[in-house]
A protein has these predicted regions:
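Catalytic-domain carbohydrate-binding cleft regions of carbohydrate-active enzymes
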Residues: 1-325
Length: 325
């Protein structure tokens, strides 16, 4: 029996083939619809906002009146946010930028009362070797990603940084949208589609916990999700069980199975940048160089000048004659 963890989500690029404001219009429409689904269908259990928190800021600048409702559903674990502020391109920003990204994401998650403690990295163009070390610095011991994994690695393995820090990694073998447009036109076809996706994963899985990623770029939640999961569980011929799940629930089940069955996971040390299974897109290292130069100048001035010198005001405050006596 396989456990199919259906993860309803979207992958959100704030600007890409459309402008930021055009994509924000879509984002507002998406979250408005999500709130309607959550209001009206108690069986629609979870939706993940791509591991980012900046989308909440973008939405609330237009729909501030929905803050309380968003906060409620986040605290109820029906909307999952974080741990990132924004999904990083790991090779194009400084190490400190990556750390601050997680730190700001943590602060925003605390404001809403819930934080997804998974290193979710669905689409960065390959991965730095120190990422497990950075994640463990924020008490995150699991990660899920797609690109850069060499052929032959299973869906679950251990990723290790050069300093020895390790995380349990879920390899999104067929990407972050292996059931992106599920459910389909009929309940029967939806059953067959989910069964096909499970059989594809079976060839590469070393556990019985399968990630079924129901989402892709800028896609909205599907209102028939809960009904389609019920139909699948009642009629599938293989005895598999589908559940409307979350990444934390998936990793809890995965960790328990690894422990119960004494599964020995392969270990990968360092960078994940193999191009054979998924495009590395190395052209991003040199495209629009003026943007990269300005970004590097801004982050360097913040890291090396503005922030270090700003602390001197606090030091000097303590040098007043009565304070130092």
């Amino acid at each position: 029996m396989k456990n199919l963890h259906v993860i309803s989500h979207t992958h959100w690029d704030r600007e890409w083939y459309r402008t930021f404001q055009q994509f924000r219009m879509q984002l507002v429409h998406l979250i408005d619809n999500l709130l309607v689904i959550l209001d009206n269908d108690p069986d629609y259990l979870h939706y993940m906002l791509d591991g980012q928190t900046i989308v909440l800021e973008d939405y609330l600048r237009v729909r501030m009146e929905n803050f309380a409702k968003l906060q409620q559903y986040i605290q109820e674990n029906r909307i999952l946010i974080g741990p990132w502020y924004i999904l990083p391109d790991e090779f194009l920003v400084s190490p400190e930028s990556t750390v601050r990204n997680l730190l700001i994401g943590k602060h925003i998650c605390e404001l809403f009362g819930q934080r997804m403690m998974i290193g979710y990295l669905p689409d960065p163009f390959v991965h730095i070797g120190q990422m497990p070390q950075i994640l463990r610095g924020f008490n995150i011991d699991t990660a899920a990603l797609w690109r850069g994994v060499k052929p032959g690695m299973p869906t679950a393995f251990t990723w290790q940084a050069p300093d020895g820090s390790q995380v349990l990694l879920a390899h999104l073998y067929f990407g972050y949208g292996n059931i992106a447009h599920w459910p389909v036109d009929t309940l029967e076809n939806s059953l067959a589609s989910l069964e096909f996706a499970a059989k594809r994963l079976e060839l590469h899985s070393n556990t019985s916990q399968y990630l079924m990623m129901q989402g892709t770029d800028h896609i909205e939640p599907h209102p028939a999700t809960a009904e389609s999961i019920r139909f699948y569980n009642e009629h599938n011929p293989d005895g598999n069980v589908a559940v409307h799940s979350t990444l934390p629930a998936f990793f809890a089940a995965l960790s328990q199975e690894i422990e119960d069955k004494n599964i020995v996971l392969p270990v990968h040390i360092g960078e994940l940048r193999d191009p054979q299974k998924a495009h590395m897109l190395p052209g991003v290292l040199s495209s629009r160089m003026w943007i990269k130069q300005r970004n590097w100048k801004a982050q360097t001035e913040l890291e090396r000048w503005s922030e270090p010198f700003s602390v001197w005001t606090e030091v000097l405050e303590r040098g007043e004659d009565r304070a130092c006596c």
